[in-house]
Amino acid sequence: FLVGAPGSRWSGIGQLISENFDYNTTDKSPERQYIHGSFSGHSGSYFGPEMELGNDFHRLEQSYMGYARFEAMCNSPFKTLSDKPKLIKCHQFAYGLDWLKENIQGSNILLVKRDSDKSFDWWKQAGGWDISYPNYAWYVDDVHMQHYIDTEIKLANIFVNSTGNEWATFDKKWLDENFGDSDIIIPDSYSDVEVCLIHTFW
């Protein structure tokens, strides 16, 4: 599961991981793509309210009494299911991190964090309300967007602290330690991004 506030550069990190470490990427399609200049863009399925899938993913505890229906929703955009890991992307998982940890065992939760103001500014630079994919209507307007970015960062911090984990800088060393050695070059633009990978055990 990939979790990060808008503008946190979470999409770029998700693409870097899924394209270089043998992930299931059969959810990609021309309709599920947004490219903006040098911005890495959006690719593949995104979940959350007002989006194509997972309209109730901002209220997991109230919407999902069991694992099966949630799993079916997560699997639904993938043309082919296999043993390869899938990257399930949702900003609003921030509101249900404890539920994910307690109910979806044997998985990983990758949280991505960046300064709130920088996140908002980058989201606007990448297109803001003109971003064609995914749909950001749930965030309403600039004022609400800034509030939600703040809130999602705070909830991620609380979760990381409560599970006894720590944030780390997203760099080559962290990537190699957590996903295996690679020849990936991480752009300097990610130097202000922090990450935390949390395992949910059986």
List each language-model region with its residue ranges.
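PAPS-dependent sulfotransferase catalytic core
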Residues: 1-75, 188-202
